[in-house]
């Protein structure tokens, strides 16, 4: 489910797909001596020097770099006013408006060079200049366009990006000249690092400011269920007077980006709601996976339908556990639920903890991940060596499967609860739609 771009290779690869190498970049070579010591200080000299050499070569040539390559070179050469003009030309050439999805990946660089230009023109700090650039750019964007563009402002792992730049420099060692295509690649990597390390300390606050202008955000709604439990929800509403339908996800996963997920729904004209399994996040109750999600989703849907901002219609969507909870809600047939859009839904009792009388250990650690606290136990769950070898340890122990947690050394009470129901019995059937429930289904799926 991890949807935010955190891997440096992904960031660079996606940005590169927007750009096209031209004949100039393919045909020419440029002098470059890779520094003997590859560190930030040496690259801060070598890469801008390389960028200026490429620009000088272009001035001497009858050919021109494609604008999609040129602005990377100009950023690396610290020619930010030129880079801003080139980016605007690139947008115009391709028909990419400020709000277009195809041009969204360039927004961080565009804001960076615009801010650097303001620094030079107005003699202000970069922080003040970037705030002005950000506000000027986003003020005129509609909610969907702003959401798309802000998705590119999350800081990627800069240390990994620096290591990848260093590796790219090492690959061209031992030669006095490199192709312009290689030069563009080095400058592109360098420009991304320069951009993100400058803007990363500023973007969270600015994104929060913009969101507050667009939406009413309740990051900690608490809803009582009929049996006295409390479930927690994130609610994001567009700042409009009209009553709106609600797009709901119900999940056990307390990922940091669930707020962004609710904002995405609000950006598309819905009230965005993410509800959480009882016991998760700020719910004071014990964590209960699967068993109460249908009842609790129904309670949340009914609560939503009574709110003054709701038009009485709720649709659910999502995958994996979030897909299961839709079928769990359908079993209880809340009147306000008008559609579900599940994909790749989890189905407890099939595959967890066994399939066709064969016990599976693939999800053995999952109960710890989701029930060890209000959030997610990433540390324990990511102990890959422990979980990947547990199956063999149990097999070699000769002990019955019900004692696998004793082999591991950490009690797994949810597993013990589940293996008491090896068949798809009433325990599992009570959790989600099955059998005659499908015949009663009267909403689009």
Stretches with model-predicted labels:
Residues 145-197, 206-209, 331-440:
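Accessory cap/linker subdomain of secreted extracellular hydrolases
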Residues 442-445:
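Catalytic His-Asp charge-relay segment
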Residues 25-215:
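N-terminal targeting or regulatory segments adjacent to alpha/beta-hydrolase or S9 domains
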Residues 318-328:
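Glycine-rich nucleophile elbow surrounding the catalytic serine of serine-hydrolase chemistry
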Residues 201-242:
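N-terminal cap/lid segment of alpha/beta-hydrolase-fold proteins
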Residues 308-320:
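Alpha/beta-hydrolase fold nucleophile elbow
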Residues 9-22:
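Bacterial N-terminal signal peptides
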Residues 238-305:
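Cap/lid segment of the alpha/beta-hydrolase catalytic domain
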């Amino acid at each position: 489910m991890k949807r935010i771009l955190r891997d440096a290779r992904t960031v660079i690869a996606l940005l590169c797909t927007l750009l096209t190498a031209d004949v100039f970049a393919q045909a020419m070579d440029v002098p470059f001596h890779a520094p003997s010591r590859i560190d930030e200080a040496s690259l801060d000299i070598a890469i801008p020097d390389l960028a200026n050499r490429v620009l000088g070569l272009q001035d001497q040539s009858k050919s021109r770099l494609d604008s999609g390559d040129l602005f990377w070179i100009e950023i690396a050469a610290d020619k930010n006013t030129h880079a801003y003009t080139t980016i605007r030309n690139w947008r115009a050439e391709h028909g990419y408006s400020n709000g277009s999805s195809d041009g969204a990946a360039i927004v961080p660089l565009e804001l960076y060079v615009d801010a650097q230009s303001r620094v030079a023109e107005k003699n202000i700090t970069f922080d003040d200049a970037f705030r002005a650039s950000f506000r000027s750019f986003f003020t005129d964007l509609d909610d969907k366009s702003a959401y798309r563009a802000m998705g590119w402002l999350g800081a990627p792992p800069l240390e990994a990006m620096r290591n990848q730049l260093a590796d790219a420099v090492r690959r061209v060692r031992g030669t006095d000249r490199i192709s312009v295509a290689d030069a563009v690649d080095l400058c592109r990597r360098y420009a991304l690092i320069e951009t993100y390390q400058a803007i990363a300390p500023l973007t969270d606050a600015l994104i929060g400011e913009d969101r507050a202008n667009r939406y009413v955000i309740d990051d900690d709604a608490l809803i009582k269920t009929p049996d006295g439990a409390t479930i927690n929800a994130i609610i994001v509403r567009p700042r409009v007077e009209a009553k709106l339908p609600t797009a709901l996800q119900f999940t056990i996963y307390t990922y940091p980006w669930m707020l962004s997920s609710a904002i995405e729904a609000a950006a598309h004209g819905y009230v965005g709601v993410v509800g959480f399994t009882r016991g998760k996040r700020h719910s004071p109750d014990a964590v209960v996976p699967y068993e109460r999600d249908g009842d609790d989703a129904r309670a949340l849907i009914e609560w939503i339908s009574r709110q003054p901002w709701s038009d009485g219609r709720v649709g659910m969507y999502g995958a994996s556990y979030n897909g299961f909870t839709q079928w769990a809600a359908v079993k209880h047939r809340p009147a306000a639920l008008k559609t579900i859009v599940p994909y790749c839904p989890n189905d407890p009792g099939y595959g967890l903890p066994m399939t066709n009388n064969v016990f599976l250990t693939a999800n053995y650690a999952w109960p710890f991940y989701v029930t060890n606290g209000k959030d997610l136990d990433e540390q324990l769950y990511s102990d890959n060596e422990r979980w990947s070898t547990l199956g063999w340890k149990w097999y070699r122990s000769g002990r019955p499967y019900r004692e696998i947690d004793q082999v591991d050394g950490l009690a797994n009470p949810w597993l013990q609860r589940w293996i008491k129901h090896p068949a798809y019995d009433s325990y599992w059937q009570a959790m989600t739609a099955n059998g005659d429930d499908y015949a009663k289904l009267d909403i689009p799926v």
